[in-house]
Amino acid sequence: MNELDSLRQEAESLKNAIRDARKAACDTSLLQAATSLEPIGRIQMRTRRTLRGHLAKIYAMHWGNDSRNLVSASQDGKLIVWDSHTTNKVHAIPLRSSWVMTCAYAPSGSYVACGGLDNMCSIYNLKTREGNVRVSRELPGHGGYLSCCRFLDDNQIVTSSGDMSCGLWDIETGLQVTSFLGHTGDVMALSLAPQCKTFVSGACDASAKLWDIREGVCKQTFPGHESDINAVTFFPNGQAFATGSDDATCRLFDIRADQELAMYSHDNIICGITSVAFSKSGRLLLAGYDDFNCNVWDTMKAERSGILAGHDNRVSCLGVTENGMAVATGSWDSFLRVWN
């Protein structure tokens, strides 16, 4: 037996030891713990606003911290900032590349970012002295498409890419400060922890990873999915996160327990998940699907509590407002819908 085989064997035995330790510590399940909880009943939401203006598939959206404005990115080559109360377009920004896959709103409300098949993250300043929106910085450096980006603040942004890495960038200098390496497939999504000290990523290697932003290292890896992970989102308290995958399941992972707590699936659901978001309390998990619907899951009981049906094509993105009062869905049908 050569050295490589013996190392493989050693790695397997270590993995099994970790599995056994997890099992030993797992004295209850989420479903058992949730038996005494009152069921939440049927969740019925209505479309309160329809945002019309994009001329092609919408690929991404992100709410601003004011819970009023949101940014969306479409294949029509436009980034639109909307006022969701009035449905007015605050800004319509023409992009240099129409192959956009992600967009993000800075916490301050002063900047938006986007990127895609141009392999870079473009930052736009919404609050210039002249009143026009312009590119304030382009961040090239990834060797593959940009799948997701999220601002830490006005000068730092985290990106994920098809080059199997994530990156932390200094916007002022335009340089990548940290590269987060470890995934063995395209990284499709990321979610920042509420305290912004860590983030979680989901990738085509069917695993999710938790990263320490300051140390630049992977702290934990969460296997379990059987296909690409397309979406991740932190639980509101930062102690857990949910994933959505092409294997037609969403899953809840607990960081402290270092394992999967629940799986959200249904025999009738056979298509992939594109996007996930929690309600403000975390009791509801909203997930967008390839079958044009958005399913609402009871996080604790792992049961479906409702369906948001209204789009005529794939639901590609969704987001819950900071104040928890509304959810927006974006679709390949070119419309955004705001529900509550």
UniProtKB/Swiss-Prot annotation:
Protein origin, superkingdom: Eukaryota
GO biological process, one term: cell adhesion involved in heart morphogenesis
InterPro entries listed in its UniProt record: G-protein_beta_WD-40_rep, Gprotein_B, Guanine_nucleotide-bd_bsu, WD40/YVTN_repeat-like_dom_sf, WD40_repeat_CS, WD40_repeat_dom_sf, WD40_rpt
Any Pfam family hit: WD40_Gbeta
SMART domains: WD40
UniProt keyword terms in alphabetical order: Phosphoprotein, Repeat, Transducer, WD repeat
Tissues where the protein occurs: Expressed in the brain neuropil and cortex, and the thoracic ganglion (at protein level). Expression detected in eye at protein level but not at mRNA level, suggesting cross reactivity of antibodies to the similar Gbeta76C protein.
Mapped WD repeat ranges: 53-92, 95-134, 141-179, 182-221, 224-263, 268-307, 310-340
Any one GO cellular component localisation term in the record: heterotrimeric G-protein complex
PROSITE patterns in the cross-refs: WD_REPEATS_1 (PS00678), WD_REPEATS_2 (PS50082), WD_REPEATS_REGION (PS50294)
Gene3D superfamilies (alphabetical): YVTN repeat-like/Quinoprotein amine dehydrogenase
Similarity section: Belongs to the WD repeat G protein beta family.
Record's function text: Guanine nucleotide-binding proteins (G proteins) are involved as a modulator or transducer in various transmembrane signaling systems. The beta and gamma chains are required for the GTPase activity, for replacement of GDP by GTP, and for G protein-effector interaction.
PANTHER family linked to this entry: GUANINE NUCLEOTIDE-BINDING PROTEIN BETA G PROTEIN BETA
Protein's recorded name: Guanine nucleotide-binding protein subunit beta-1
